[in-house]
């Protein structure tokens, strides 16, 4: 049996886990090579009792090693985060804080500054001002007069200061390790997190709680399958949640299986619009639908980052609680990767594709002549609201150079506030999101303080800026069939068609003018559309070619980059999930793996697709952002 870690730098016996509050007296040896008697306390910030106005950000934990707290105040100071700690003894300690100066690559003036408080007293050292990369920064010496201590994080700017952990030590030269391997070993040793995780047994485990994963879990549960749904955010919906605020798109209830999509209609929001107020996205509606299913167990705030495999099958997925660091193992005969990033498939060694394939690879007319790493980007959306009296916004000195010519005199950043195209969507997620933030702040600060027509914006208040990026593309797991532009545009129907994809082939590219003005780092995009007739996605695109018990739904299915342009829409992903949940039922009833469902039991799956699992009696509310197809052009002719 092989154990695959989510980070290549982590050894098998060092799964990346988070710590709560630890006191250690005694001998400890870790990867820095230091072996000494230490008297130390380590505090992981995401485990703070009170988060105040700080948010847990897990988007880059597979790269930098940890969730962390983020002071995302959009220019307004956020309330302190705090926790209570028991020290092993009184005395003088050295303090180290793991943090980074997030805008250092763009300015020598830091944006996200904060202080550490001890029993209500703020220590003078300011953090978030030094290293561009995550590192331990010395906070000097602190005196602990009481064993019971309150530790707090105090925001100084409201502009996304961030803190991973705080370390107190009495020993000389006891600087904690900064590499992921050393940090993992330190945390595991201090908390005993290398102990065997709690075991859970299910028929079907779905990882990823976006529309695709949520529909997959509900679909299977309604068909009698015992399901676990693992989601690494506090809400369901993914890009359609109030954290990202992208509205649903594409069509449902299409031939050859018009009942597919009733589930999307049942749990999806009734209003459209990107970057709208929170209630538009109806997070509670999705949550209530999941909680109503007796066969479905939901694990919010759990990040799957380790698996076990045997004989090209996943045996278990291990996920950690983002706040407590507790690990749980999920055993099942069948899994679904609905993470978007293809995380579970990647950990299992599944074949995958990324970037753009060359034209010769699939003979796609829209593909580039040469393969490259260009992908569609991440959107950091935002909007303002008009208020009755003038409202200030800081005239930031750390933003990008701006001018009237560079500015966008608007009050909302929609899908086309998109960046990161050409970057690594996994390894550079934090950079991409941060660049999305700095351009929003730079533009808004300029409009409020220096724009020629700034009077137009004096009563505009920056209401919301996403700190969770809306991602479109990263890994695509390879199935027994790779769907391409050719089948879709030529209407080459395959015998295992399932959920129809109806949106245009919608591919995004950097806006050339924006690219030039901002020296090759565009944050605005354009979309090029090719209308299609709806096309049923082959079932063979919904399971892995080489991991025998892994299915997938959403943007990580087996398609070319060009074909992804149509299948990636969330209503389509929801229908994929509905099909994958049905396939899990067929698999359970026949003790069959996904490939065998295609080969031997597809007729059973067809019957389920004809019936659907959603409530067909509900009013149809998914009539916004449906997109145009060639069907309308045919009607006009």
Regions found by a protein language model. Name each.
Residues 225-226, 231-308, 353, 376-384:
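Conserved N-terminal/central alpha/beta ligand/cofactor-binding core
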Residues 213:
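N-terminal Rossmann-fold NAD(P) dinucleotide-binding loop
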Residues 198-210:
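Beta1/beta-strand and adjacent pyrophosphate-binding region of the FAD-binding site
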Residues 191-198, 239, 301, 313-316, ...:
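Flavin (FAD/FMN)-binding glycine-rich loop and adjacent Rossmann-like elements that form
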Residues 1-36:
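Bacterial Sec-dependent N-terminal signal peptides
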Residues 220:
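Aromatic pocket-lining residues of Rossmann-like dinucleotide-binding sites
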Residues 36-197:
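Extracytoplasmic
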